[in-house]
Design a protein with these regions (language model features):
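A translation/RNA-centric and nucleic-acid-associated enzymatic feature enriched
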Residues: 1-123
């Protein structure tokens, strides 16, 4: 309709997003999440994060997670956090798409794969 290579996809189902994604009060069972696609390729993914301790516990249980195993993560939420969000962008994906590079590893300065794991960093 708008003749654009970009499209936003929003309001993913709660079952398809991580526990920390905030639920959308206006759309039952959906989250305040989005992806930005460029010519069918996901470039950016983001969401408003859940900042309320009790809701995080509830969402962890909904996902089948044990909140006790996330105690360190949850500590800050006990004292209150402001509303916040986050996103991640795939710059290498965008570079590969703009330059018509078929393999993303060729658009990445230090590509990672199963054969390029630096064991010193994991010790």
């Amino acid at each position: 309709e708008f003749n654009s290579d970009f499209i936003f996809i929003t309001n993913y189902p709660r079952t398809k997003r991580p526990f920390y994604a905030m639920d959308d009060k206006e759309v039952e069972g959906r989250t305040k999440c989005y992806d930005l696609l460029f010519r069918g390729l996901e470039l950016l993914s983001g969401n408003q994060r859940e900042h309320r301790y009790e809701q995080l516990i509830e969402k962890m249980k909904f996902k089948g997670l044990d909140p006790e195993k996330f105690d360190f993560y949850l500590q800050a939420f006990k004292y209150g956090l402001p509303p916040h969000g986050g996103l991640a962008m795939g710059l290498e994906r965008l570079t590969a798409r703009f330059l018509n590079i078929p393999n993303i590893k060729e658009a990445t300065l230090f590509p990672r794969d199963i054969n390029r794991i630096d064991k010193r960093l994991s010790e």
